[in-house]
């Protein structure tokens, strides 16, 4: 009896092979032939799962996004104080270990490539800015955001902070390490929030 292959699982394996090729050779080396070889498939077999190279690259890009989103969803349901929850979510969006640094390197390579292929994937609609707006709204709903804060501008500042930290953490992970990233994000969040009495009670029961 022929071995049945999980179609979606194989597509994800091919996407992960695409990441490895990009990390080793850059986007210019992410040809269908190189990806097929990395995935241990013939070119014809690769075409069975993805009819075009852009279809494969779009899927591989979205898979990176889904991995981060899944980790954020896991944090969102945890029983944490609001500022701590926001901090943990933001830390998931900045590379702080070998795995997430690789993901970020692939993501930046994809977004640079996708700038000229809006029909493939519009990086300006990657959900990150809307995520920042949701976090600012969450702080506001928790009565923590400073009263006169401009929520739209604060979302933009948070986006710029996370994006900049992500780039610098990828380029210089020794200097921009997890501890420094956490301190920068914590100080920024504290600067836009009022004191949380629940945190005070937790420190001084």
From Swiss-Prot:
InterPro entries: BetI_C, DNA-bd_HTH_TetR-type_CS, Homeodomain-like_sf, HTH-type_TetR-like_transc_reg, HTH_TetR, Tet_transcr_reg_TetR-rel_C_sf. Keywords: DNA-binding, Repressor, Transcription, Transcription regulation. Coiled coil: none annotated. One of its GO terms (biological process) is regulation of DNA-templated transcription. Transcriptional regulation of the polyketide synthase operon. The keyword Transcription regulation applies. Residues 31-50 bind DNA. This is HTH-type transcriptional regulator PksA. Residues 8-68 form the HTH tetR-type domain. GO terms for molecular function: DNA-binding transcription factor activity; transcription cis-regulatory region binding.
């Amino acid at each position: 009896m022929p071995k049945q292959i999980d179609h979606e699982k194989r597509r994800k394996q091919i996407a992960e092979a695409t990441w490895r090729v990009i990390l080793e050779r850059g986007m210019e080396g992410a040809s269908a032939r190189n990806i097929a070889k990395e995935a241990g498939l013939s070119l014809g077999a690769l075409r069975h799962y993805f009819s075009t190279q852009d279809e494969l690259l779009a899927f591989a890009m979205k898979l990176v996004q889904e991995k981060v989103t899944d980790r954020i969803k896991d944090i969102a349901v945890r029983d944490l104080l609001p500022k701590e929850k926001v901090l943990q979510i933001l830390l998931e969006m900045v590379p702080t270990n070998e795995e997430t640094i690789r993901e970020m390197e692939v993501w930046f390579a994809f977004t640079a490539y996708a700038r000229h292929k809006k029909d493939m994937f519009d990086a300006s609609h990657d959900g990150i800015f809307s995520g920042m707006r949701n976090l600012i709204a969450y702080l506001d709903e928790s009565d923590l955001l400073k009263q006169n804060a401009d929520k739209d501008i604060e979302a933009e500042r948070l986006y710029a902070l996370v994006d900049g930290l992500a780039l610098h953490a990828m380029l210089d992970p020794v200097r921009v390490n997890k501890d420094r990233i956490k301190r920068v994000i914590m100080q920024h969040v504290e600067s836009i929030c009022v004191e949380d009495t629940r945190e005070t009670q937790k420190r001084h029961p």
